[in-house]
């Protein structure tokens, strides 16, 4: 299947381009109180080193808004303010923030939205129309119920509202907590506008459940060419959100970066400690940004075949094994020497690619 991404309008959040031909960016959201400036900066630095591109923060009141101004001045990443109920907070934050997310289900009247738009237009920052299945405007929930039709009605209504105000720096999200409904919502809206989409399954749960739900929903949409920026929503797992999001992009084949590790699940043929080896390899290669296929296999049944498609590979045997690079055996060593030599070959491969 040939991957073909929808051509969307391009916007900018800080120094990060979204839409058009820009790479799909990965977002997260802080879970500390925004008024805790030091706590927020600590989490922002963690996300920066984890590989996040953009971060969103909640803003409940003016204490949060004033703290956010200080945080923004020291942040290593572009920041989006997440606004519910009080549009005046969005207007205040628009003076210094990189983007605003509004929930059309609770932001209030047209006049409220108009004030937010004027503030964002003045600073040329984008607005995300964040439609959420759990908080749709009454006019649409009364007419359709809490379903895809109501979400679609809300999105189209608010898009037109912003366009009528001559505002087009828009991105849209259509989030639900259900995998199938999330897919259907984004698919329904995609042919009807050319604005970039922010993908996510809302309230996806803890690490295990979020990984499963997000992989199915976001992977499905990405393979259909839908999506310009994304978040894997995960209860209490900051860096893991980024790691899973990057893995979805890589393993779907949509965006090549970092190491793709091929390893067998082990069986009765294994005569080495493959599980220990793969844990070491994962830890020692997680810093690599260059796209690289590596294979760590426990016996000869599939090892040599997988090695032909890998940049660097290990084929374990009984008390010994092979290190293979681009299909050619480069070393036959004792088991306790294999992983170290393998990692040297991996680093050498990375250096060669970085030179190119």
Swiss-Prot record:
GO terms for molecular function: 4 iron, 4 sulfur cluster binding; 4-hydroxy-3-methylbut-2-en-1-yl diphosphate synthase activity (ferredoxin); 4-hydroxy-3-methylbut-2-enyl-diphosphate synthase activity (flavodoxin); iron ion binding. It is an enzyme of class 1 (oxidoreductase). One of its GO terms (biological process) is terpenoid biosynthetic process. The keyword Secreted does not apply. Its EC number is 1.17.7.3. Pfam families: GcpE (PF04551). Pathway: Isoprenoid biosynthesis; isopentenyl diphosphate biosynthesis via DXP pathway; isopentenyl diphosphate from 1-deoxy-D-xylulose 5-phosphate: step 5/6. It comes from the Bacteria. Its cofactor is [4Fe-4S] cluster. Binds 1 [4Fe-4S] cluster. It catalyses: (2E)-4-hydroxy-3-methylbut-2-enyl diphosphate + oxidized [flavodoxin] + H2O + 2 H(+) = 2-C-methyl-D-erythritol 2,4-cyclic diphosphate + reduced [flavodoxin]. InterPro entries: Dihydropteroate_synth-like_sf, IspG_bac, IspG_bac-typ, NO2/SO3_Rdtase_4Fe4S_sf. Keywords: 4Fe-4S, Iron, Iron-sulfur, Isoprene biosynthesis, Metal-binding, Oxidoreductase. [4Fe-4S] cluster binds at residues 264, 267, 299, 306. Converts 2C-methyl-D-erythritol 2,4-cyclodiphosphate (ME-2,4cPP) into 1-hydroxy-2-methyl-2-(E)-butenyl 4-diphosphate. HAMAP family: IspG (MF_00159). Belongs to the IspG family. This is 4-hydroxy-3-methylbut-2-en-1-yl diphosphate synthase (flavodoxin). It comes from Campylobacter lari (strain RM2100 / D67 / ATCC BAA-1060).
